[in-house]
Amino acid sequence: MIYDTMLITGCAGDIALALARIAREAGAVRRLIGCDVHADHAGPAFFDACELVPRANEGTYLETLKRIVIAHGVDVIVPMSEAEIAVLLAAGHLGGFAGVPVLAANRLAIETGLDKYATFNRLAAHGLGVPWTRIVGEAPPLALPCILKRRRGQGGKDLRLVYTEEEVEIAKQTRPDDLWQELLLPEDQEYTCGLYRSRAGETRMIVLRRRLQGGLTGAAVVADSTPFSPLLHGIADALDLTGSINVQLRLTADGPKVFEINPRFSSTVRFRDKLGFQDFIWSLLESRGLAIGAYRAPSPDIRMYRCADEVIIG
């Protein structure tokens, strides 16, 4: 057991449920507490208790979170939504909150990943492969068709393809703070990459070629990480990375190009854990000053599939 009582936020979501299952299976904690903005979810089947919290942008969020920590004797917090991570970052609580550690990557990695324009600028400044990216209200797209996406928040939300100058003009009026981004092709060359750098400076990675279903990775196959290794090492260096992030890219005719960095655990975290890339457990161990052991990358071409599950609560 690494911790006694763990609080995982966003417990209605797929990532939090995956982390809860990993923690249970590994015997990493004695008790699991979850919290979310509503109670209509499967969390009670996986957590010992589920609490309600206001949305992260509401003024009472941190106060409510503190009450939960104290009431349940929580000794580690794992924030799962980017909105919550952003609030903890802004309040100076990335290292710890209410006297207990917060499990997260380093500050620079989080600041960069939360802002997709900052992601573009930092990686481009380090000579790493990125699609051209512009702020909608400041400059027109370099070419059409292109992607229109949020600057902050989940990249898949409100993402759309823009084909015409008429659509460009509408976006300039309605979404001036969002981003134009190069359309990366081919579509079937999309990869999600787990990237972990230990406190001792060891970099570990796993690359999965994925197929999306409903915005999530529905199926994936392990790819040889060798062609992506220089890029991923470069990202870890550019972010002075400590901890775990998720890198999303497409392999184009001009090489791999990164279109997003998620500064949190990935929705494929349980896929990866089963393949030996145990970034969640490594993060817990290192937060306690414990050794993480060796990592052996899985063989290419291993396939994995996300399956529906039935949960009864009552």
Describe each model-derived feature in a short phrase.
Residues 1-103:
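ATP-binding N-terminal substructure of ATP-dependent carboxylate-amine bond-forming enzymes
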Residues 35, 148, 181, 247, ...:
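Active-site flanking residues adjacent to catalytic metal/cofactor-binding acidic residues
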Residues 39, 152, 263:
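Short, glycine/acidic-enriched loop or turn micro-motifs at the edges of active sites
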Residues 43-45, 61-63, 110-117, 158-159, ...:
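Short, charged, surface-exposed secondary-structure boundary motifs
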Residues 72, 226-314:
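ATP-dependent carboxylate activation and anion-phosphoryl transfer catalytic cores
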Residues 107-187, 197-202, 226:
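Active-site nucleotide/adenylate-binding loops and adjacent lid/helix of ATP-dependent enzymes
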Residues 160-240, 250-251, 255-257:
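Phosphate-binding site of ATP-dependent enzymes
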